[in-house]
Structure formats: structure tokens, C-alpha cells
């Protein structure tokens, strides 16, 4: 998009869970990443996949007072905060390790792969 003079921001979401996933997405051109499932897992989600029913047995995706009482909000908030802080620390470390001051300086040059298929399709150098 940049090569064609397009001024759009690219936010990647879906299947991103770890700082490694986030680094790859940003190095490949994403301006930001969005997380949802990973944060829900940190909160305590057990992936019953019934969020839309309002009957989440963990108490996350419900308005039922009995089910809501099962969620320890303080404990869940600490786990989400720990996940986000650890992720941020890992992103800062990777940025420094690759010789950059800003995560948005990352590029394909900072990545490598052992997969010929990935290399052929993404421009990431083959290790």
C-alpha cells in the first residue's frame, strides 16, 4: 500500500496470540494488531463457544447474576494486565534486539523462516 501512495492504516486481527505473532504482523506492514481471544483466555475464558447465548459458565459473556458471580473480576483483571505487560515487554525486547528504537521500524529484513513456502510467498528470507 505504501508503494502505491495509499494512506491507510492496517490493523491485523485473527489468530494473533503471542508477542511473536504481533512482531511478525508489524514487521510485515501492519500498523497495529488487535487482540480478542487472547485477552479473553487471559481473563479465564474456557472457550465453550456459547458467548452469544448469554450462558457462559465462566461468567464472562453473560448478564445472568448467578453466572456472573463465577468470574473473579480482580483475578481476571490481574491476569489480563499480566498478559498485556508481558507482551509489551517482549515487543520492546525484540525491537531492541533487532537494533531498532521503535517497533514500527521493524521490516521483513528482521524476520527469517525455515519454510521455503513461507519465504517464496512473503519475501521473508529463508534461514
Regions found by a protein language model. Give the residues of each.
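Short hydrophobic "strand-cap" motifs at the C-terminus of beta-strands
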Residues: 13
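Alpha/beta catalytic cores of nucleotide-metabolism and tRNA/nucleoside-modifying enzymes
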Residues: 1-7, 17-23, 27-127
Amino acid at each position: 500500500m505504501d508503494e502505491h501512495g495509499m494512506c491507510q492504516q492496517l490493523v491485523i486481527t485473527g489468530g494473533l496470540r503471542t508477542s511473536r505473532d504481533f512482531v511478525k504482523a508489524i514487521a510485515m506492514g501492519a500498523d497495529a494488531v488487535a487482540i480478542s481471544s487472547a485477552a479473553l483466555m487471559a481473563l479465564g475464558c474456557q472457550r465453550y463457544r456459547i458467548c452469544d447465548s448469554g450462558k457462559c459458565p465462566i461468567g464472562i459473556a453473560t448478564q445472568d447474576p448467578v453466572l456472573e458471580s463465577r468470574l473473579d473480576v480482580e483475578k481476571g483483571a490481574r491476569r489480563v494486565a499480566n498478559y498485556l505487560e508481558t507482551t509489551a515487554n517482549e515487543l520492546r525486547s525484540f525491537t531492541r534486539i533487532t537494533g531498532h528504537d521503535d517497533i514500527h521500524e521493524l521490516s521483513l529484513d528482521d524476520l527469517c523462516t525455515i519454510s521455503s513456502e513461507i519465504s517464496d510467498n512473503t519475501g521473508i528470507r529463508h534461514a
